[in-house]
Every structure is written in structure tokens, then in C-alpha cells.
């Protein structure tokens, strides 16, 4: 049975810079957007806000939905990745709460697009999607019957 990993990611932008999280995987420091898996009993928007806080210490809500990517990782793991935009008025300090995150960095789009240490090609693709200017209302991915009604199934 096909069971893709459902993940969320946040393109966080402030003062012309983008927020990336740095984590060490197999001895190499890699950049990613604040991102992670959808957990039971949370919406996609809630998951995005939670992952942002866990990985950066920033408490903010997504303002827009950007895109959903269907991706097969090199190890053949399938992903459905929901990408959100978060615009902050100014660059703010970060304090990761997730021990997997080494640090956070505010960098330019050019630095991300030219980086050789991206966790996946979706990191650069997310910046390109953000730069395209396409934004969708969060209601586009509305919740049905939320919270789940007990005894329905």
C-alpha cells in the first residue's frame, strides 16, 4: 500500500533574508527550511507553526499556502510536502528547541540557490516557488470535520 510521508515546510522571510535551519546528517551540515512531519490530530497549518517553533523558537502562523510538492527521495521514500509562507516584519533571534537543529541562519535567496549543502532539492525549489509570487489562501487546504468526530467510522 502506498503511504507517503506527509510533511510541512515554512519559507520564512524578513528584511530580504530567508531563515534556514542547519542540521548535521552523516557528518555534513545541511540546510533546510523549518519543516517536519504532520502529527495525528493537527492540521497542516498547526503542524507548520509547531515545526517553526520547535526548530527555531519563533512563534508565528503561516499567512499563505504556496504549493504542495509530491517528491520521491533518492532512497525511494515518497513525500507530500505542503509549503507555507511566513512573512516577518524583521529578522528575529532564534533558539532551536529541537536537538537535531544545530543552528538557524538568515541568508539571501542567492545563497540558498547556490548552496551545495541543501538537505534536498526541495529547499531551493521552495525559494523559487516563493519568488514566483504565487500565494494561496490557507482556506485552500481547509479542514473537513475538524476535529474528527468520534464514532463516525
Curated annotation (Swiss-Prot):
Entry annotated with the keyword rRNA-binding? no
Q: Which UniProt keywords apply?
A: Hydrolase, Magnesium
Tell me the ranges covered by the Nudix hydrolase domain, including all copies: 3-131
Q: Which molecular function GO terms apply here?
A: nucleoside diphosphate phosphatase activity; ribonucleoside triphosphate phosphatase activity; thiamine diphosphate phosphatase activity
Q: Name one Pfam family in it.
A: NUDIX
Q: Which domain of life is it from?
A: Bacteria
Give the residue interval(s) assigned to the motif Nudix box.
36-57
Q: What is its EC number?
A: 3.6.1.-
Keyword check for Transmembrane helix:
no
| SUPFAM superfamilies per the UniProt record, alphabetical | Nudix
Instruction: Identify the cofactor(s).
Output: Mg(2+)
Q: Which InterPro entries does the annotation name?
A: Nudix_hydrolase (IPR020476), NUDIX_hydrolase-like_dom_sf (IPR015797), NUDIX_hydrolase_CS (IPR020084), NUDIX_hydrolase_dom (IPR000086), NudJ (IPR033713)
Supply the enzyme class, top level.
hydrolase
Which PANTHER family does this UniProt record tie to the protein? NUDIX HYDROLASE 23, PHOSPHATASE NUDJ
Q: Which family does it belong to?
A: Belongs to the Nudix hydrolase family. NudJ subfamily.
Q: What is this protein called?
A: Phosphatase NudJ
**What organism, scientifically named, is this protein from?**
Shigella sonnei (strain Ss046)
High-level lineage: Bacteria, Pseudomonadati, Pseudomonadota, Gammaproteobacteria, Enterobacterales
Amino acid at each position: 500500500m502506498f503511504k507517503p510521508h506527509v510533511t510541512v515546510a515554512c519559507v520564512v522571510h524578513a528584511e530580504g533574508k530567508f531563515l534556514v535551519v542547519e542540521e548535521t546528517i552523516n557528518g555534513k551540515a545541511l540546510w533546510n527550511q523549518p519543516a517536519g512531519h504532520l502529527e495525528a490530530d493537527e492540521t497542516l497549518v498547526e503542524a507548520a507553526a509547531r515545526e517553526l517553533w520547535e526548530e527555531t523558537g519563533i512563534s508565528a502562523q503561516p499567512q499563505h499556502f504556496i504549493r504542495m510538492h509530491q517528491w520521491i527521495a533518492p532512497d525511494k521514500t515518497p513525500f507530500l510536502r505542503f509549503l507555507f509562507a511566513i512573512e516577518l516584519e524583521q529578522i528575529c533571534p532564534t533558539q532551536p528547541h529541537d536537538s537535531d537543529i544545530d543552528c538557524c541562519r538568515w541568508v539571501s535567496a542567492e545563497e540558498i540557490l547556490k548552496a551545495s549543502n541543501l538537505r534536498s532539492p526541495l529547499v531551493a525549489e521552495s525559494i523559487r516557488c516563493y519568488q514566483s509570487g504565487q500565494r494561496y489562501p490557507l482556506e485552500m487546504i481547509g479542514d473537513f470535520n475538524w476535529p474528527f468526530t468520534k464514532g463516525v467510522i
